[in-house]
A protein has these predicted regions:
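Short, flexible catalytic-loop segment of classical short-chain dehydrogenase/reductase
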Residues: 111-125
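Short, small/polar-rich loop/turn modules that mediate ligand/substrate recognition or access, typified
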Residues: 100, 105, 168-170
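Residue(s) in the substrate-gating loop at a strand-loop-helix junction
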Residues: 68
Length: 182
């Protein structure tokens, strides 16, 4: 539909994610695991499958996949989410290699927690009696001391979508408020 309307696809921001229920692996439900993997990993795969084909044919384009800092490390209690976001990081690298000979760039962004409804749900899962305490606990893991603002993410996506990043592909960008420095 996009190609029919606009003639080509210049940029694809492959951004979707759910956390699922917070629980140790031994308490995780396989159905819940599959649900998280379907949205977070299969969704990215399907986006790549269809958009990468178009971009390879047109010999240009930029794809930005959203993973998470959890896709570069481990985070107790959200194993399905962590596994799904590690998979996104791997898919990004493969797509970058496959797209590079055709002028298609593929990168991943790895945000720390972002001020969104998804984080409110996760905080409630970690501490149903005091979600604000859960938020403060997560913020203590971030040296800057706060969640990312959606605009923080948008700024990096705009850079990766632009010609200013024409020699960048297969990269993993952390937007983590200093978490990697610890």
């Amino acid at each position: 539909a996009a190609v029919d309307r606009f003639g080509k696809i210049d940029v694809f921001f492959n951004n979707a994610g759910i956390v699922g229920k917070a629980a140790p692996i031994v308490e995780q439900d396989a159905t819940e695991f599959d649900k998280v993997m379907n949205v977070n990993t299969r969704g990215v795969f399907l986006g790549l499958k269809h958009v990468l084909k178009v971009m390879i044919e047109q010999k240009s384009g930029s794809i930005i996949n959203t993973s998470s800092v959890a896709g570069l490390m481990a985070w107790e209690g959200i194993a399905p989410y962590v596994a799904s976001k590690h998979a996104v990081a791997g898919l990004t690298k493969i797509a970058a290699l496959e797209g590079a000979p055709y002028g298609v760039r593929v990168n991943s962004i790895h945000p720390a927690p972002v001020e969104t409804m998804m984080m409110r749900q996760l905080e409630s899962g970690y501490n149903p009696d005091d979600p604000e305490a859960a938020k403060k606990g997560v913020e203590q893991l971030i040296p800057i001391g706060r969640y990312a603002d959606p605009q923080d993410i948008a700024n990096l996506v705009l850079f990766l979508a632009s010609d200013e990043s024409s020699f960048i592909s297969g990269a993993q960008y952390r937007i983590d408020g200093g978490m990697a420095a610890k």
